Amino acid sequence: MTERSLNNLILASSSKRRIALLKQINIEPGLILPADIDEAPLKKELPKDYSIRMAKSKAEKIQSSNPNYFVLGVDTVVACGRRILLKAENVEQAEKCIRLLSGRRHRVYTSVCLLTPDQSKQHIRTVVTIVKFKRLSEQEIKYYLASEEWKNRAGGCNIQGLAGVFVLFLRGSYSSVIGLPLHETYCLLSNYFNFNLY
């Protein structure tokens, strides 16, 4: 298989966390283009299915206007049971999320979709990570909400910041919870691109 330059790769996201995670393994896409798509879940859609659909939709949206590129779409979903916790749009929604997760296990689904040029091939990987938060005090909830770290975060959670102290245990991929499963992403891209980890 011909190895290509990373200039032929588009990341369908403007997430600073995902860009930083890719740089961590020496991957710098040629282009970074956020995909504007409808992110509303379908009726009775399960969290894993939603994550896959979003990652695929982001990649397809960007590739529709850039057909000669490889496109990487990624989506992270926080779920409590079958309930999908979307990005909080205001402090009231953030409070509902953080109270729901307090003292409970939840799952974080991150799906990665790699489309080859003209969508000739489609590769999808989904990583599921189980996270349990401690039971939060009213003061902890108050301080976390005041920090505004919940903004633009799936489920209002930012375990790279203050919410990191809420985590009793994490079973799975830490990088996936942040926004990109590094192992799975590396395996997908190394089939097509020439880059060095060291």
Curated annotation (Swiss-Prot):
Cofactor(s) recorded in Swiss-Prot or TrEMBL: a divalent metal cation
Record EC number: 3.6.1.9
Catalytic function, reaction form: dTTP + H2O = dTMP + diphosphate + H(+); UTP + H2O = UMP + diphosphate + H(+)
UniProt site (Important for substrate specificity): R17, T76, Q160
InterPro entries: ITPase-like_fam, Maf-like
Residues forming the catalytic site: D75 (proton acceptor)
Family: Belongs to the Maf family. YhdE subfamily.
Name of this protein: dTTP/UTP pyrophosphatase
Species annotation: Wolbachia sp. subsp. Drosophila simulans (strain wRi)
